[in-house]
Amino acid sequence: MAESFRVLTLNCWGLKYLAKYRNERLSQIGTEIASQDPPPAIVALQECWTQQDYNAIREATQHILPHGKFYWSGIFGGGLAILSQWPIEESKMVRYALNGRPTAFFRGDWFVGKGVACAKIRIGDGPERGRVVAVFSTHLHAPYETEPNDSYICHRTAQAWEIAGLMRSAYAKGQIVLAMGDFNMIPLSLAHKIVETHGRASDAWRLHHPDSSIGAAIDTVEKTRGVPIPDAAYNLSENGATCDSVLNTWRWNKGQQKRLAKGETITVDPSTKDPRAKRLDYIFFADAMNEYSVTSVNVGMTMRHPTLQTSLSDHFSVEATLEKTGKSRFADDPQRLAQMLTSGEFDRSNHLPVETYDSILAMITDYEARERRQRRLRLSHFGAQLTVAIGCLVAVWWSPRNFVAFLLMLLSTLGLSAGVIDGLIGGLFVGSELRALKEFEWDIRNARGVAVAGEPLGLRKPGDEDDDV
């Protein structure tokens, strides 16, 4: 069994056609991972969208990470991959039930089919192989506004709840739990609390840096702490900032990037104030056996491309060392372990405060009302356009001129097309979204019941729930 091993997570920013120098950067990412000493044993990648880029990274890291899985999801792919020193025994892709809207095509979250890449890896070599690591790599829905005005906060909260449930299930089986990725949340936010509490895991960074920042220095949540604006070096070493750092060239203004593209060497003093940097990438860890612990954690992949002089991604990596620091608490009592596994004692999750459950339920209620209004408007638009289209077709018969008939037909065609699209979204997508919200709401109500009374709600009687969606 492995005494210690390294893990790494990185958002590669590999958007096809959109990310600049994609091929060169992702190829170099593979080279940098392969040159690490000590090398990582498990790597989780996000925004690795193309098979070509995945293969380039696999080729560069084959000698240290001979096993890997590229996960397929959605229309354009979820961009998730897991690489491993040891064989991947089981694997699956779990898509999030709530994940953006198709109307936000310019954002793409719905089209890529975001979810959780799951892998079961048994660590160690030869006869000493034993413990199973449940690896989860994810990329949560992006926040396009600040909370609480973010219209997607309900989706991101549901996603945090969903991955936390997967983590809790792995914990209940006595496995080592590793959830890594770009969670698009700040520390101690609602989603963060859900993953830690409902998922029964610990934020690896806060284990070693409990007083680290809980947002960018310019954010209200951080200003209330009354701490001075940190410099770039402090943000990396103490705050774990992986995004929006002044050291990352992709966060520079257009003027600086143009100078860089012309071959000019631009350096940034690590003592430069860094008010916008924040931590969006995480490693969550749990071990029900208390056998392994996180002994070190750091921000990595901060180097630049050797020829382009750009950062390798718009995010930095998070890296951690897991070490066997003690004997399993059930090493001398395997029967007790078997009893706890079969009785479900490991599955007794921690509970969030009742007020938190209530706030989530209020969020769901508000969002559900919003989506019902959206559905009514979209279906009304479809009905109105259908009426207009029929009117235009009738008017063609009395049209005195050909060009007037052409304009009526054009109006009918374009208007009805827009109406049909709105009707499909309102009738099909929103209906599906409302059903997913019902499932999420039931989960939260059930968890609240356990937190309050110690018992789940169970199935309600017919008529207790609103079946109309």
Where are these regions (language model features)?
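Extended, low-complexity, polar regulatory segments
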Residues: Q28, D231-I266, T272, D287, ...
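Cytosol/nucleoplasm-facing, intrinsically disordered, low-complexity tails
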Residues: M1-T31, S35-Q36, A60-T61, G124-R129, ...
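Glycine-rich phosphate-binding "P-loop"
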Residues: T9-Y21, L140, P148-R156
